[in-house]
Amino acid sequence: MAEVSIEKLAADIGTSVDRLVKQFKDADIVKAANENVTEDEKRQLLDYLSKQHGGTGSEAPKRMTLQRKTTSTLNMGKSKAVTVEVRKKRTYVKRTDVEEARLAEEETARALAEQQAQLEAEKAAAEEAKKAAEEKAKKAAESKAKAEAERLARAEKAKKEAEARQAEESALSPEEKAEQERVRTEAENIRKKQEQESQRKLEEDAKKAADEARKLAEENSRRWKEEEERRKKQEAEEVHVHSNRYAQEAEDADDIKIERGGRRRKKSKRNAGSDLKHAFNKPAQPVERIVRLGETITVSDLASKLAIKATEVIKAMMKMGEMATINQVLDQETAVLVVEEMGHKYELVNDNALEDELLADKISSELASRAPVVTIMGHVDHGKTSLLDYIRRAKVAAGEAGGITQHIGAYSVETDNGRIAFLDTPGHAAFTAMRARGATATDIVILVVAADDGVMPQTKEAVQHSKAAGVPLIVAVNKMDKESADPDRVKTELSQLEVISEEWGGEHQFVNVSAKTGEGIDALLEAISLQAELLDLKAPPTGSAKGIVIESRLDKGRGPVASVLVQEGQLKAGDILLCGIEYGRVRAMRDENGKDVAIAGPSTPVEVLGLSGVPVAGEDALVVQDERKAREVATKRNAKQREIKLAKQQKAKLENMFANMEAGDVSELNIVLKADVQGSVEAISDSLTKLSTSEVKVNIVGSGVGGITETDASLAAASSAIVVGFNVRADASARRVIEAEEIDLRYYSVIYSLIDEVKMAMTGMLAPEFKQEIIGLAEVRDVFKSPKLGAIAGCMVVEGTIKRSNPIRVLRENVVIYEGELESLRRFKDDVQEVRNGVECGIGVKNYNDVKVGDQIEVFEIVQVEREL
């Protein structure tokens, strides 16, 4: 494997960069976060972590118990015999366990002795080297002094000789002078060489003594290490290899006797030893396995594929710095690291191979023109459904609760310009997911904006959805029949969202329409046809169908019903349809008017019956040829979703511990939610979850499509939840449970009412809040002494009212010096309940006698404040 940076390695194993850098530093590897690490450095880190956490090797049994049973027959006479059975049980304790203390003491003593011997040897060598160096230095100094004396003597002698030679040279010839000079030079050179040789010998002797001392210390250290390694190796062999000799010596002659026909025979010691031989043979080399890894795998499944216990995998992950549980789901990268760490090989597999195979089996045909799919989007009450209603010549808006659309309505309309498929999306803020789903399934978006209302929050959201999906936008300015209509204002506000009309030099068509009078409807249909021609929409008209689930619900009489928009191919009755984790054979298809349809082509919305369950809205719908493959894919998707859900529910993470501890004081409002269609369940769940605050949390303990059943009521009773039904009702068995358990059951048909009432319920769960409100202030004018009550303050009420039963504060120079309660309140000699502004009174403060003239007595009351979300 190539070198990787510490940041990449930390991301792969799922730990922080700072922690990994610290672990490298502890292992004597100093690295920065952006530096690379080699395989040797990673192995060194793993060795260090392994030493820190301890080994995982298996131990041999510490004791062994042998049981022997011998049977003999005792003759009591000619015709009577008694069977005698002798049972013997012996326990053998492993020698290393019995002598563990003694061996440990001997080993400690031996180690100390060796260490002491090594220290003494090093000390002796150092002293010897020091003595040798001092002696040689002394000899060198003496030699130097002697040489200096000799040099001075020679110099004096040479001086005399030079003077004598000078006297002689004056009488010598030039040849004789040259010969004398040569002899003198040679003598000087010989003397210098002798001095250099003696100095070199002194240095070599000192160096040799130091080397001998160092080698002696190294030899002692090496022998001590070899002895330590030999001892450890011997202990390891004693732990893992069992000798037959001890078992043979432990068995005596009585243990190997058997009785056969009244005669006793002894087994040979060779046979006895063979019976006691250990049956397990140590593997000659490590077993290396090849593990097939998908996108996710649980710890228990990974251990099963490695043929080891799950605890071994958890230990390996702990050594890598990752905490895990036996049911935790690991991603592919983490699983690869664990497999490599444990010395095995891996093979990556594609979890979607079966789905890819289904797509490859799809029957396709040549492309042909298809009708456009148009989604009508906009703010609530801007007239989207009324506009579509006028086009369809039917009354749809009147059937929606509260006059607002709460489902995606899919309609196919025949116009003079050809067939058009319309999708009507809700405009309420809670239906964001449904609007986004409509934008991804559409070709053209019609943005309906009321001319008298302008751009609203959901209008902006619709523009964002269309831009994100890359779908062309046509703006329909509705309600032009009203006097307050102002289309120019709509253009101005939309231009701020980068939606500019063609009249202003942009690329978006603006059409003024009125859903009430029909004004501009034809122009709108022409704009749709023109935009569809520019897009040149095509799809295969025959072959295997493919589409998207627009909406789904559970019908009491017909079972799961899914609204499917066919995008390509032909969907026929009898086809096997796969929608997410649900599948089934299409039993019947119906259009938006409830009429049966035999074949549905591209851009045709139909209701499909016959699925195994209610599919999730927004899932792709695909016709497959083999029902068995469809079942396999659905089962695999379901298992994958379950693993993802399980991974989200992991609460054993250390980083979540403190968050869970802090959340202990948060109140929870549990809700069991049932709605008529899947889209409403999603929208209501998201809206209610967003209502959660730091003090009150909304918890959806159960949700689903269809009526309220006995199971839902039991779940609500067990979790102390309220049951909310949106356009659904409870059956008879559920009502019985609800009445018996006194569960709060509420029905709604408009999402506004549902959210408002849940808000009110959450407000009632808020902890009460109190505040102090000052109701009166009295100034101390004089202080009197009372034998019963102590100091009595003669006061004048300067603000508000002084009440007897309320708490007070004593202020001196506007600083609170005491807080307590009134013990006595009198007007003249009479006890009174309250004294108003401008009236004198006597006040006795309970357990406080240090009242002085000029102090102020402040009276307050504690008032509960109504909390709001």
UniProtKB/Swiss-Prot annotation:
Compositionally biased, Polar residues: which spans? Answer: 67-76
Q: Which InterPro entries match?
A: DNA-bd_dom_put_sf, EF-G-like_DII, EFTu-like_2, IF2_assoc_dom_bac, IF2_II, IF2_N, P-loop_NTPase, Small_GTP-bd
Q: Which parts of this chain are annotated as the region G2? A: 403-407
Compositional bias annotation for Basic and acidic residues:
120-241
Q: Which CDD domains match?
A: IF2_eIF5B, IF2_mtIF2_II, mtIF2_IVc
Region annotation (G3) maps to 424-427
A Pfam family per the record: GTP_EFTU
Q: Extract one GO cellular component term from the record.
A: cytosol
Q: Where is the composition biased (Low complexity)?
A: 110-119
Region of interest (Disordered), residue spans: 51-78, 105-277
Q: Where is it mainly found?
A: cytoplasm
Q: Which family does it belong to?
A: Belongs to the TRAFAC class translation factor GTPase superfamily. Classic translation factor GTPase family. IF-2 subfamily.
Its protein name is Translation initiation factor IF-2
Gene name of this polypeptide:
infB
